[in-house]
A protein has these predicted regions:
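Amphipathic alpha-helical coiled-coil segments and their boundaries
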Residues: 94, 101, 160, 167, ...
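Transmembrane beta-barrel architecture of outer-membrane proteins
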Residues: 84-86, 107, 150-152, 198, ...
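Periplasmic alpha-helical coiled-coil/stalk elements that build and connect Gram-negative outer-membrane
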Residues: 167, 176, 182-308, 418, ...
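Small/polar, glycine/serine/threonine/aspartate-rich low-complexity segments that form flexible
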Residues: 70-79, 126-156, 279-305, 311, ...
Length: 503
């Protein structure tokens, strides 16, 4: 049960009685309304909760000789990869997840418009027309029928005075929600670009690995032909042929697995961009070429370091969204408190009246103006419960903010560690490929000369293919570590001077 007190002070009169005192009263009433609408604060202004941020990243190096590109909205251009540029543009134009995020921004903007409209007076038009028929049933003039027509029209004015800040705090909360949804859209855009870039790198690495296995199979088939010639002349045994066939079958199995992985990467890009698989393959440079074809282009990511933690955490879209949600939750507490207090509404109306009955007509104007006061007397504790609920939501929002800061910090640290690891693996795997290639070349010549066994040749061939595959994976991981750093920092990075070097 919820009882309310209603006080209605209104003044009404006919047009002929409306003198200058009426207009003075109206001006005084509006002046009081403007004064009262200033509101009374029910709680302190919102202050961003203190955030536990590191003073520096654990893997941070010196900041000298760096080119700042923090917050670059088109950071993927730094990879100098036309396929990533084209597919990212396509994804931005037709990705359902991004479209949903942008629609939530528009929804929040519309909600802000609704909340903001409550701060302004509302003006409506009231009009009605009535035709009535009455019959006299008294003994004196029994059976006399009278028709009457009446009409009225005029504007009606209403305005809730924001005495305790309920409306203004609702507007603040709606504005904070809009800022949060805008940050969410930026985060979605950042993640989408990162996903496209990651998948392009993965597809190119997969294609390069596929070509490694094609070359390996072609080499094994040549060895098989030579072994069979030797077998016919008695220089080789059936065991040698079986060993070659075993290795060839293993390589063909690896190739089939690689082809499946490449198809999955193409499908992932199709889902992200809405482009056909043929368009994706054409952009990335993936073909069905056979052995002996050069590997596809793999971009080399520029050397990058994150900005200082305070800069990253202040601009990262996920952190911004969480902080704005906390601000909105704080404003909601004030709204819940204001809902427990009286409300003052100012209403005014002006109406023209016209009546015609019994052959005569009458027209006149009426007006009314006055405030009304409503307030809860008994609500069973619902108001207090709403305040506690709003306070709990604020506590949850601040906890989510702290969790987001910690997660962002962890992501940056992990990306930095992965950068260091990937760079070391690129160097070591490159050295491994050179050594394995030399070993295989020498072993192949020695086997043809009969100096070593087929087992030794196959072992060196297997090591060479594995070394090539490891280098491809390391280069892919290096690019993806850079992308992970960009995503983790919200593109708040700086570049070292060798930014233009790429393959």
């Amino acid at each position: 049960m919820n009882s309310r007190i209603l006080c209605d002070a209104s003044l009404r009169g006919r047009r002929s009685l409306a003198g200058p005192w009426y207009w003075r009263l109206s001006i005084h009433a509006l002046g009081m309304a403007m004064l009262v609408s200033g509101g009374c604060a029910l709680q302190p202004a919102y202050v961003t909760p203190p955030l536990a941020t590191p003073t520096a990243w654990s893997a941070q190096r010196e900041l000298s000789e760096r080119q700042t590109v923090g917050g670059d909205a088109s950071w993927w251009h730094l990879l100098h990869d036309d396929a990533i540029d084209a597919l990212t543009k396509a994804a931005f134009a037709d990705n359902p997840t991004l479209i949903q995020a942008l629609s939530r921004v528009e929804e929040a903007r519309a909600d802000l418009g609704v909340k903001g409209a409550a701060t302004m007076p509302a003006v409506d038009l009231d009009a009605n027309v009535t035709r009535a028929k009455s019959r006299n049933t008294s003994p004196i003039q029994s059976g006399v029928t009278m028709l009457s027509n009446s009409a009225s029209a005029g504007p009606a004015f209403s305005w809730e005075l924001d005495l305790f800040g309920r409306i203004s705090q609702s507007v603040d909360a709606a504005r904070d929600h809009l800022d949060a949804r805008t940050a969410d859209a930026a985060s979605t855009r950042l993640a989408l670009a990162a996903d496209v870039a990651n998948d392009v790198l993965s597809l190119r690495a997969c294609e390069n690995s596929r070509r490694v296995w094609l070359d390996d199979i072609a080499s094994r088939e040549k060895t098989l032909s030579l072994t069979r010639l030797r077998l016919n002349t008695g220089l080789a045994s059936s065991v040698d042929e079986a060993r070659i066939l075993t290795g060839l079958a293993s390589s063909r199995t690896s190739l089939a697995t690689q082809v499946d992985q490449c198809a999955r990467q193409v499908n992932a890009l199709v889902a992200l961009t809405g482009q056909s698989s043929d368009v994706v393959r054409r952009h990335v440079g993936v073909t069905q070429a056979g052995p002996g074809v050069d590997q596809v282009f793999m971009p080399r990511a520029p050397r990058a370091l994150p900005e200082l933690p305070a800069t990253v955490l202040a601009s990262h879209p996920d952190v911004v969204s969480a902080e704005r949600e906390a601000a909105a939750a704080w404003a909601d507490i004030a709204v819940a408190r204001a809902d427990r207090l009286p409300r003052i509404d100012l209403a005014a109306a002006l109406s023209g009246q016209w009546i015609r009955a019994a052959g005569s007509s009458l027209d006149f104007n009426t007006w009314s103006i006055g405030p009304s006061l409503t307030g809860p007397l008994f609500d069973g504790g619902a108001g207090a419960a709403n305040v506690r609920s709003a306070q709990a939501r604020y506590t949850r929002a601040t906890a989510n903010l702290q969790a987001t800061v910690r997660t962002t910090t962890e992501d940056v640290e992990n990306a930095l560690a992965e950068q260091v690891s990937a760079a070391a693996r690129v160097t070591s795997t490159r050295e491994g490929v050179d050594a394995a290639h030399t070993t295989f070349t020498v072993s192949n010549d020695q086997w043809k000369a009969g100096a070593i066994s087929l087992f030794e040749l196959e072992d060196s061939r297997r090591q060479f293919a594995s070394a090539q595959d490891a280098e491809i994976s390391a280069r892919r991981d290096q690019g993806q570590a850079w992308i992970a750093l960009v995503k983790a920092t919200g593109a708040a990075i700086t570049l070292t001077p060798d930014t233009t070097s790429h393959e």
